[in-house]
Regions:
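Short, well-ordered beta-strand segments enriched in hydrophobic/aromatic residues
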Residues: 2-10
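Mature, folded catalytic cores of secreted/periplasmic enzymes
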Residues: 6, 49, 330-332
Length: 352
């Protein structure tokens, strides 16, 4: 859930029927080629939420690089919310009337309307399932215990002021810490923070263990890559070192599986959002066990279940691996996490 804050400063009296509005196009529901989209409006606790989604959701259906999801529900929440079409938008602009009955095949929008001079809108995305993790379908961390996107929006609305205060307090702390380094470092750190946090998804496996999984954009779309985690860790070493453990946990888990029959750390866990086994450095052989298993340059696609294969499968080309880099990354991350105060249990479990 995200906030869009606004305040109106009129150059005179506002008309009695003034409003502030925000809208989203149906393109948020699919990747590339236009698809059938449906939607509606939810009456909630003191506000409304309009939503739309692909008519046929294909959850976690694409592991290609640099793509938008072909699944999930997109929301706008405001005092009043609408699902409208092109024709409905034109009618609203020309005559001030809202058509809440879009026709089939019309291009859809969701619209939020407030009638206060100062306020905020909420936009939200419910991916329904966030990560496939070696046989487990995992939801976003907030949804543990049966919570829904409605709970997330209700919470974000009820705790709006408190959340913004926490953000302001953290921002002040970050600014103070960055001032020790030098002028301009705070601006750089703000950009790095947004990139690092935005690149990761937080989920929890069936054992109750945290997983903080990155997506490696413009580099095969790999998930949980050790050499992406490594440059991401400074922020979390400072403010939440347990998230560094959560970055490493997947590498440890996959390294113990029979298909990974090496004594060094793997590079990745698959391609986002599928943790189904490392995809980097696979062996291309012209035999019946390998030929046709891997395709390059094809999109959309989903991963094969490499993690279930026995050691004899010989899936990987050892000449394409990075043992020094990945082991170095993991050793430094684990030592740094412990030094920063993370739970030592993960290290004890994996370095007996």
């Amino acid at each position: 859930v995200c906030y869009t804050e606004y305040e109106i400063f009129p150059e005179g009296e506002l008309p009695a029927d003034f409003s502030a509005a925000i809208s989203l196009d149906e393109e948020f529901c699919y990747n590339g080629e236009r698809a059938w989209v449906v939607g509606g409006v939810l009456p909630l606790k003191g506000y409304e939420a309009a939503y739309f989604t692909r008519g046929r959701n294909m959850v976690l259906s694409d592991t290609s690089d640099c793509v938008a999801p072909d699944w999930g529900d997109v929301y706008i929440a405001a005092e009043e919310s609408w699902l409208v079409s092109d024709a409905g938008v034109n009618l609203d602009v020309s005559e001030g009337k809202t058509d809440y009955n879009p026709k089939d095949c019309e291009r859809l929008y969701i619209l939020g309307v407030n009638r206060s001079k100062k306020g905020y809108f909420m936009t939200a995305f419910d991916d329904k399932v966030s990560i496939f993790y070696f046989g487990e379908w995992l939801k976003c961390y907030f949804f543990e215990g049966g919570k829904t996107i409605v709970d997330a929006m209700d919470f974000s609305r009820a705790e709006h002021d408190s959340i913004l205060k926490q953000c302001a307090d953290f921002d002040a702390k970050l600014k103070e810490d960055c001032a020790k380094v030098g002028e301009g470092y705070y601006t750089l750190a703000c950009a790095a923070l947004r990139q690092s946090v935005g690149a990761h998804k937080l989920v929890q496996n069936s054992k109750g263990e945290l997983l903080f999984l990155s997506k490696e954009n413009n580099s095969n779309g790999c998930i949980g890559t050790a050499d992406v985690s490594y440059p991401s860790i400074p922020l979390y070493l400072l403010y939440n070192p347990e998230l560094v453990n959560a970055m490493m946990r997947g590498i440890y888990d996959f390294a113990k599986m029979p298909v990974w029959n090496y004594d060094f750390a793997p590079h990745d866990l698959g391609t986002y959002p599928w943790c189904a086994g490392q995809v980097y450095g696979t062996a291309y052989r012209e035999d019946k066990y390998c030929c046709g298993m891997f395709s390059t340059g094809v999109s959309p696609r989903t991963n094969q279940m490499l993690y279930i294969r026995p050691a004899e499968s010989d899936v990987y080309d050892v000449n394409c691996q990075m043992p020094v880099e990945e082991c170095g990354n993991m050793l430094v991350m684990q030592a740094a996490a412990i030094a920063a105060g993370a739970d030592r249990g993960l290290a004890r479990k994996n370095f007996p």
